[in-house]
Amino acid sequence: MARILIVDDAEFLRMRISKMLLAEGYEVIEAENGLQAVEKYKTEKPDAVLMDITMPEMDGLTALKEIKAFDAKAKIVMLTALGQESVVLEAIKSGARDFVVKPFERERVMSAITKLLA
């Protein structure tokens, strides 16, 4: 089954998403900021990334750009809070395949991952 890198500075969200994905048979890798995300992407080579935009140390947009520079084919879905439309547009222009608005429903996350891996 596919390996998914979950990147969010909120531990409870990482745990919630991890439980969802593990229940569906996915392998999960976690990072708590963009800097860790870039490092783990390079070393763990996940099949997809689900990444928050607003994080300490390195934000999700910067991490997205660094990951895409390393691997142009990287499959990334961004997590965003309501009201960040301009940031979402920048993420899509920078190579994100989709976005999920927080708070989210399980079905929306699973739909985004399924489409990403199709």
Name these PLM-found stretches:
Residues S86, F104-T114:
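C-terminal output helix
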Residues G25-E32, K40:
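Short hydrophobic/Thr-rich beta-strand motif most characteristic of the beta2 strand and flanking loop
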Residues N33-Q36, D59-T62:
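Acidic catalytic/metal-coordinating carboxylates
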Residues E44-L50:
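Active-site beta3 strand of CheY-like receiver
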Residues M15-A23:
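Charged docking surfaces used in two-component/phosphorelay signaling
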Residues M55:
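Receiver (REC) domain active-site loop signature in two-component systems and cognate sites
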